[in-house]
Amino acid sequence: MSAFTGVIVEGKRCLDAGASTGGFTDVLLRRNAGHVVAVDVGYGQLAWGLRQDERVTVLDRTNIRHLTGDMVGEAIDLVVADLSFISLTLVLPALAAVSKPEADFVLMVKPQFEVGREKLGAGGVVRDPALRKAAVIEVAESAYDVGLGTLGIAASSLPGPAGNVEYFLWLRRGAPEIDHAMLDEAIAIGPQ
């Protein structure tokens, strides 16, 4: 998230989609988020200290695709997502529906869950930069279809567990469509 200096966390009501053990939830709280709704399809994974924090609402056993405003309560200012085994394209409508019109979205694009099994290399790694680029474009275009344009793209400095190169997208309503030159630059300076 530090790649996107325009994303303000302090005092914001945040949603951590795919919270798991709470990596993003912890980052948000350390940056003084007002509240974090931690959502995961699993159960009991969120670190105990985060689970006990009064600034955190835990929604375990919750499929992001079925998330509603009633479930999260007050609308969300900042959405972060780090999802596995599901394409972001499938959850964008639900994430957009529970957020405020001026909300920011910082999504981790994991090409291994976007390109389809038939395009994965050995060990589930997407090695072809063209496939990684196509994955980011597909997510950004799906976001644009629900009204979210792209303000920033950054390669994650840490590869995924199997060695996959992953990317962050910064999205907001009213922002332009994806800038392919910005994407090419993120791919060029990111891990290969």
Residue ranges and their predicted role:
Residues 3-10, 72-73:
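Glycine-rich helix-loop-beta junction characteristic of Rossmann-like nucleotide cofactor-binding loops
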Residues 22-23, 44:
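Glycine-rich SAM-binding Motif I of class I
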Residues 111-128:
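Short, glycine-/aromatic-enriched active-site segment of Class I SAM-dependent methyltransferases
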Residues 165, 169-192:
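Flexible, glycine-/basic-rich loop-and-beta segments that form/coincide
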Residues 35-90:
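S-adenosyl-L-methionine
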